[in-house]
Amino acid sequence: MSTLPVSSASFSSSSLLPVNDKSSKKQDVARNTTTFDASIWGDQFLTYDEKEDFVVEKQLVEELKVEVRKELMIKDYEPTQYGKLIKVVDAIQRLGIAYHFEMEIEEALQHIYTTYGNNWINSKNLESSSLWFRLLRQQGFNVSSEIFKNHMDKQGKFKETLCNDVKGLLALYEAAYMRVEGEHILDEAIEFTKTHLAIVAKDLSCDSLSRTEIQQALKQPLRKRLARLEAVHYIPLYQQQPTHNEVLLKLAKLDFNILQSMHKKELSQIYKWWKDLDLQKNLPYVRDRLVEGYFWILAIYFEPEHSRTRIFLIKTCMWLVVLDDTFDNYGTYEELEIFTQAVQRWSISCLDTLPEYMKLIYKQQVNDHQEMEEALEKEGKAYQIYYAKEMAKKYVRSLLVEAKWLKEGYMPTLEEYMSNAVVTVGQALMIARSYVGRDEMVTEDTFKWVATDPPIVKASCLIFRLMDDITSHEEEQKRNHIPSCVECYIKETGASEEEACEFFSKQVEDAWKVINQESLRPTHVPFPLLMPPINFARICDVLYIDNDGYTHAGAHMINHIKSLLVHPMV
């Protein structure tokens, strides 16, 4: 149903209630269950070394930040040096330290946009114009892709002579992923650069640094990368560049390790909460995937100021895991109906109406929300929990729809399936909750905006749902599960499985175009509030880049987690 952390699993079509459920004494109830492996992490993250206070390092970071701010002072650059300035901005962003300099970066790029509009000073240089285009589009400035006509022939094709400009090709490739619907010049740019970069990547005469960057880009363009993982990837590459800025490099390494320590401490705190619930004993059918869940949340917010929101999000994430496994993997339809009704009422008085094993789920759900509501009430923000609850109610209702389809053996139309499945993926719910407990930028209008299913939220949800279904539909059909979008499409059109997956992969790319369009100014909400739906879409490209990274947490997923939460940057 929804897309939530899993690891490898074994399937059993009819199991019995766990022995700790009192109702099992009355009768044996056949259940459609999946047995999941234990967490591969054990108690590795349960304790945190309090000695890691980084007092000296934090002071050094503050000193280095002063030096970097000088590098970003737009007034200190002649117009002919703006090409150098945008390279500094690009390095800062890719090194993962841009959150320290948001105001300075905005001021610099705003000045460049105001001064030049669509006419970049160095438009004849493919690398420079591509970098200019990408950085301004990322910042929400709607610069025109017509600038790339400078590099096309009379037939409207990119000049073959560009093949000799490897840096320019790579920069154009990355820029083209900022495309919106109807930008055929950027569609053409992706096809052109992909073809030629693939050749370069196999050319042993090309330097290893360039080959590494190209291979990474072809696997995952910058637009779809997560900031923290990009920092892990880029810091060593940047260090190898002969012209690297030593101040930026030193700051990036120090900052990475300070953040990693903070995240480990946070994970240790949430780990204690998770262990106290003792779900392995009380709800043994539930996946134990706290670390994977926290990795997911770090993809949305990694900055220190979002700690409270992160903790609320990880609790939400794990609550969704429990709900997903209960609806997908354990509860009878009658029990799920009762639970759904209780969620709609959202009152602790509903406990007595629930089956014994559901009481822990419901009580914890109510308590976690009440705890956050009480904290927010002191700040005049209790309304945020109202909206969080309403979206949770919608989510649970949609889970029940799928449970009903499964019970009745109903094959939904593709339209029916998708309208419900973009809710059960849980993405919109998580996006809304990413605003809970944030700074004053968030207002009640922010939650009203999310509740209308705006295009950027719809697109983010669609990406998650489609990428999940494409990678996991075969395995899900081996057990008792509702059809995915792939099966629905095949039934309606007579297409092959390969054709169905190609169709939905194209829809994923189209959804990214919507995200890019909705990120251009003027935006419906402040620009920083668009980052959660963008980052939730990006996490899909990490989870599903090779296969279902949650269902089968392979080496790449384990390495990602270790790189962020175990291994320091040296």
Locate the predicted segments by residue.
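Terpene synthase/cyclase
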Residues: M1-V570
